[in-house]
Amino acid sequence: ISFSLVMCDDIRSRKDNPDFAVVRAMRPDITALLESRGVPVFNNLKVSEICNDKSKTYAYLSTNNIPVIPWISAEAGESAPPAPFIPCVLKPCGGHGGSGVVLAKNEAEYISLAGSMRSGYVIQRLAEDSSDTRVYVIGKKIVAAVMRRGRGDFRSNFSLGGDVCKRELTDEEKKLIYSVCELFEFGLVGIDIMYYNGHPVINEIEDTVGSRMLYATHKNIDIVSEYLDYIEKSL
């Protein structure tokens, strides 16, 4: 398999279609365009449209009886809805890597932070602790799991200085991940698990998941090679 890097803005002007495309951008419009031309895309449009929007993710999972942390959605520019939970976490629907995620510890902070949001957002109950587990999935296969823990921050993102270590999933966690996999045709994603009321719940599904944590904790896994093997068998 040979590859070439094509920027999103150049896709529309190209006349030739590739045999397949790996879209590493949060651009459902580009994925939709490629699929309309008959190009197999990894990840596909359903994954891109749902998983790059936290409100859509939580709504879709909840509709399919997949547990998530209690949440509501809100629109920027409107009066903030009454705080459903205090403390609570506010997240931009299209945020990535912990960017724009803020914690409101009381009602006054909530009103101030909600008023500062510049795009649609979700309001979520604060999880039991700052750790979560990212599960790397190719297709319907669990590749590996990495625990992340915030360092002086309620956010656990590796890019924000969180500590990471490899871990084994429990049977309950595996069952949860496989239940999510049945709802999608994934290429490569990261599914984030947190705990609520003593049980695992889904926090996010990362469409354009990065692999630095995986490389840091699982030296024996070549995620790119495994992903390419999966793509080749899928075509």
What is the role of each PLM region?
Residues 1-71:
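Conserved N-proximal alpha/beta basic substrate-recognition cap immediately N-terminal to
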Residues 18-20, 88-91, 135-137, 199-213:
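A short beta-strand motif that forms the metal-chelation/ATP-contact edge
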Residues 26, 72, 93, 126-127, ...:
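Anionic group-transfer/hydrolysis microenvironments
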Residues 26-28, 47, 142, 148, ...:
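Short glycine-enriched loops at secondary-structure junctions
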Residues 30-31, 98, 199:
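Glycine/Thr-rich phosphate-binding loops of Rossmann-like dinucleotide-binding domains
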Residues 38, 46-132, 170-171, 235:
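Active-site nucleotide/adenylate-binding loops and adjacent lid/helix of ATP-dependent enzymes
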Residues 101-184:
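Phosphate-binding site of ATP-dependent enzymes
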Residues 155-202, 214-217, 224-235:
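A long amphipathic alpha-helix within ATP-dependent nucleotide-binding catalytic cores
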